[in-house]
Amino acid sequence: MKIYKDIITGDEMFSDTYKMKLVDEVIYEVTGRLVTRAQGDIQIEGFNPSAEEADEGTDSAVESGVDIVLNHRLVETYAFGDKKSYTLYLKDYMKKLVAKLEEKAPDQVEVFKTNMNKVMKDILGRFKELQFFTGESMDCDGMVAMMEYRDFDGTQIPIMMFFKHGLEEEKF
């Protein structure tokens, strides 16, 4: 299994257990699912509660959301009230990524710059439909992932988007 981490903050963003698609060599689109699960739900294999005592069932907290967000402890951020503030963040973040690329993969700099401009125009056109998420550290200097719901055969499916060049792969 591969874990994809933010190269700036080290936060875990997602893993390869989800359906992934690379768009224009710069954006990973990761398909999520809406889930509901009990917090702290522990199931012990082979455990058989005593038949003599009535089960006093406890109220357990339930969490609902997109599996990628819950499993990797992503945090929704409301830092971008408008397209202008998000564009300012992107310009700053892209400079950081170009600096990292020049260090580690100079051959990728031109691919990144060319394709990123195209992809960002498309994303900015859908700005109002997007939700934004940081890693667990909630550090906006790192990657801010995007999520939108897309219609597939009448069903709304959450799709998260991550910048390929802002991630490092870690094998488990």
Swiss-Prot record:
It is found in: Cytoplasm. InterPro entries: Mss4-like_sf, Mss4/transl-control_tumour, TCTP, Translation_control_tumour_CS, Translational_control_tumour_p. Pfam families: TCTP. GO terms for cellular component: cytoplasm. Keywords: Calcium, Cytoplasm. The keyword Mitochondrion does not apply. SUPFAM superfamilies: Mss4-like. Residues 1-172 form the TCTP domain. One of its GO terms (molecular function) is calcium ion binding. Involved in calcium binding and microtubule stabilization. Belongs to the TCTP family. This is Translationally-controlled tumor protein homolog. It comes from Bombyx mori. The lineage of its organism: Eukaryota, Metazoa, Ecdysozoa, Arthropoda, Hexapoda.
